Amino acid sequence: MIPTFYQTHLKKQLTSAQFLVMTTLLSVMQSEKQVRLERLARVFPYPITTESRRRKLQIFLDLPNLTISLIWFPLITYWLTTYCRIGTRLSIAIDRSQWGCINLFMVSLICPRRAIPLYWSLLPKLENSNFESQTTNLDQVLPLFSEYKVIVLGDREFCSVDLGNWLKEKGVSFCLRLKKNLCIETEHLVWQRLDELGIVPGTSLYLQGKKVRKTLPTTGFEVACKWKRNYGKYQVKEAWFILTDLGSLRAALNAYKQRMGIEEMFRDCKTGGYDFEGTSLKGNRLVNMILLMTLAYSSAIFQGNELKKKQVQEYVSRRTEQKKNIADGLHLVLD
């Protein structure tokens, strides 16, 4: 089931035949939880041969108007204006996923315990993203959030001080996890690696007004340091070192914790859900297939939130039964 505002927008961008294929394909994707073209062609409800259905879907994926800017961005804008007040603080996570010969850069909007893809692109080489690719992808989505307070979250691949400076110039807050071998100036002309600051499990530290990066040092940043406490068998291997401008340790840690939503999103879209790593599509067809998957995935999230607001989720989801004691069951049988 596709939300009404999705259908209204898609009808404006597609012909009647294209809209019918789109909505049918989204319904199939939601029911099958698959984006593999062969699987979709096999179950697509159209009275032609499987090979003809596969070819029909390939032609659909090649449509020139099937783009992120035309199909997806207006839906994001509608959702923001409808459900988010102007000035609301929103978190955007950046990440990269690689499988086979595919290197995918993803920008996502953090939702409660999940994330929704905003923009994605295929990197030309199988390597970490660089400053240019990071800023190019962020430039695509930041204009959508001009009326909101944005925090960009990134793991250690995105620990570039240059990226922090670029975000600061854009008026965007950030929490970028640093590598432990980065140096900061603790005293005048005294530089220390982050892992030499004496942070141990159960301790934290917040550094302000320190120079960061021994080569081409930069000022104006803050570094939040936190090593979670060990509990029994639960051992935390290393500390968090986060480059930020949020002003306090608590704010930085609470913001960065939200980045885990993009990990859950990738799990839902990979082996735990739509299995987009299993598709053999490449290039523009893969980008457009991820667009369709995003429409199916996000519509399910939006509808789930609406059901929660109506407090009817207990009637449409599987009830979790409590584990019964075997002895109690045996007692009932004997009686």
Please tell me what each predicted stretch does.
Residues 1-34, 46, 53, 71-73, ...:
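Single, function-defining residue in the core of a domain
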Residues 37-47:
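DNA-recognition alpha helix
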Residues 54-114:
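Active-site-proximal, Lys/Arg-enriched surface segment
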